[in-house]
């Protein structure tokens, strides 16, 4: 199957957030509560249009991906989150960005919520063991 051209792909925004709660929560708990609060506020169709995904969550801070046309609705849905695992909690959006890297640099300076792996580039023209 062919990939979509870059001009036809949906554009995304990345929201950096912090969770303020009585007890620590895991990534799965956050995903469940974010989708639940979005669905109750916006309805199933608009929640689907928002395309909300939790990319990373660590030590109370994380990154959520959403559609660029639905950032306001996503922020509103995140503001309605009041409980995680039955304990009082609130989700505070620190800011929005067009790339994960910039969201991490600007809003999550001391956290490693989303660190892509760095792979070494190898020169495929050289054969191993052969001296030039």
UniProtKB/Swiss-Prot annotation:
Compartments where found? Cytoplasm
Molecular function as annotated in GO: ribonuclease P activity
Which keywords does the record carry?
Cytoplasm, Endonuclease, Hydrolase, Nuclease, tRNA processing
Enzyme class (EC, first level): hydrolase
Stored InterPro entries? Pop5/Rpp14/Rnp2-like, Rnp2-like_sf, Rnp2_archaea
**Pfam annotation, one family:** RNase_P_Rpp14
What GO CC annotations are associated with the protein? cytoplasm; ribonuclease P complex
What is this enzyme's EC?
A: 3.1.26.5
Q: Gene3D superfamilies under this entry?
A: Ribonuclease P, Pop5 subunit
**Which GO terms fall under biological process for this protein?**
tRNA 5'-leader removal
Q: Which reaction does it catalyse?
A: Endonucleolytic cleavage of RNA, removing 5'-extranucleotides from tRNA precursor
Q: How does it assemble?
A: Consists of a catalytic RNA component and at least 4-5 protein subunits.
**What functional role does this protein have?**
Part of ribonuclease P, a protein complex that generates mature tRNA molecules by cleaving their 5'-ends.
Check the record and name the PANTHER family matching this protein.
RIBONUCLEASE P PROTEIN SUBUNIT P14 (PTHR15441), RIBONUCLEASE P_MRP PROTEIN SUBUNIT POP5 (PTHR15441:SF2)
Q: Which family does it belong to?
A: Belongs to the eukaryotic/archaeal RNase P protein component 2 family.
Q: What is this protein called?
A: Ribonuclease P protein component 2
Naturally occurring in which organism (per UniProt) = Methanosarcina acetivorans (strain ATCC 35395 / DSM 2834 / JCM 12185 / C2A)
Q: Which gene encodes it?
A: rnp2
């Amino acid at each position: 199957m062919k990939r979509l051209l870059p001009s036809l792909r949906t554009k995304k925004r990345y929201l950096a957030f912090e969770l303020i709660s009585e007890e620590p929560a895991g990534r799965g708990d956050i995903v469940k509560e974010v989708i639940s609060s979005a669905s109750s506020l916006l309805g199933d169709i608009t929640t689907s249009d928002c395309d909300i995904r939790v990319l990373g969550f660590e030590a109370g801070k994380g990154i959520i991906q959403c559609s660029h046309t639905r950032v306001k609705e996503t922020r509103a849905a995140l503001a309605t989150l009041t409980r995680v695992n039955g304990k009082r909690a609130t989700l505070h959006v620190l800011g929005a960005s067009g790339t994960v890297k910039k969201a991490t640099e600007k809003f999550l300076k001391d956290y490693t919520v989303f660190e892509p792996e760095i792979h070494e580039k190898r020169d495929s023209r050289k054969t191993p063991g052969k001296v030039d």
